[in-house]
Amino acid sequence: MKTMKLVVALAFCSQMAYAEFDHKEVIEGPFTQGSDVTEQCIECHEDHAKEFMKSSHWTWELEQELPGRTVKRGKKNSINNFCVSISGNEPRCTSCHAGYGWKDNSFDFTDMTKVDCLVCHDTTGTYIKEPAGAGEAMAKVNLERVAQNVGQPVRDNCGTCHFYGGGGDAVKHGDLDSSMSYPEKDTDVHMDTDGNDFQCQTCHTTASHQISGNAMGVSPGGENPIGCENCHDSAPHDNKKLNTHTAAVACQTCHIPFFARNEPTKMRWDWSTAGQELTETKDKNGKKTFMNKKGSFEWQKMVPPQYAWFNGKADAYMAGDKIDPAQVIKLTYPLGDINDSKAKIYPFKVHTGKQIFDSKLNILITPKVFGKNGYWDKFDWDLASKLGMEANTTMKDKGLSYSGEHGFVETEMWWRINHMVSPKEQALQCSDCHNKGQRLGWQALGYDGDPMKNKKGKRHPTD
């Protein structure tokens, strides 16, 4: 039977290269797990699987340049101020990996059958991964039906992970959440379901399973940028005065006046209050502001961005880097200033936090919070720190382990704001920034006050 199926599949392979077709002709279950589906997929799509296995969506790391050093960095080894790190927490974190079975450091990245084709190509809307199952599909999913109805990705495929990063809707990004599945024009003019109806890959163009674009949080040194200029020229306005702004002001700055337009986004996470006997409360939007196992949170909706100069490059804290606990630790942040001719003013979400660090070694700790003996199990920070550091291969390679002493330090993490582009009628107006406008902090940006008023003050090289 398998031989016959393979013959039929091969007969369709050339057709599949040019157009979608009915996979019911070549896919036959039943399937007990996702990797069983993949085994059938690669009978025709082995080359595609090999392409995908070269992507950062599979490896969760990318070689990149940070100031003064070349690093391999990605979700695999970065530290954030949400759930902190995947080390020791893999079964929970890797529910967003496009693969099956990444339970710990022994995961085999060369095993093609572990690639999850369905999470990106499901068209039924029924494919769901176990929240803490190391990427495996939920038992209730009809894998045969999903596999027989695959197609090009749509927003919901990407959103399965990117809308829910950090453990919930709108937690991390601020400009990506469930409202982007079928957005109205006021939410995003590009993805507007009744208008342009862009899919993610309309802008994040893809070739050989390599998807353009890099997130600052995990790949601050990534050199695969996309931007408004990919479609729009440098003089997009009829008003010449507005066009003079484009050399120093990014399109997003004026055209994304607010993020988290529909769903509140997390703006602060304080781990230091975890374990305290406090009442679990909710804010006006129904979001929890304290959880015993996670600490305290702050959420905001319709958030004006924070603005900073950005020249397309960024820097980041790497596991094992020394810190000064008296300072706010910047986990990722944009580079550039008013003197940099390549920099423009961009909008950002800045997520602040208070997270655990080794107070003897002065390094950030990657605690084990999930699973047996994790913090959520034992509520023991010393044990969670010891186990998390032991599970972190980067720390082990640097000869670092938990010293037995810990504290909590203030951190911040910068996130680029690129989505939720408003209709042009809702873009910022001159008076939002100039004259009495308070939108931009001129002095924080390096100006001597409003440059419209102080024409002899400090200027950007392009002004």
Kindly label every feature range from the protein language model.
Residues 2-9:
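Sec-dependent signal peptide recognition
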Residues 9-19:
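Hydrophobic h-region of N-terminal signal peptides that target proteins for export
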Residues 18-154, 160-225, 229, 233-243, ...:
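Sequence context of c-type cytochrome heme-c attachment sites
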Residues 224-332:
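Repeat-solenoid scaffold signature
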Residues 294-334, 338-346, 351-355, 367-391, ...:
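Long, compositionally biased charged/polar accessory segments in the mid-to-C-terminal portions
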Residues 422-424, 431-434, 438:
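Terminal low-complexity/disordered tails
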Residues 429-432, 446:
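Extended, compositionally biased alpha-helical segments that mediate assembly or anchoring
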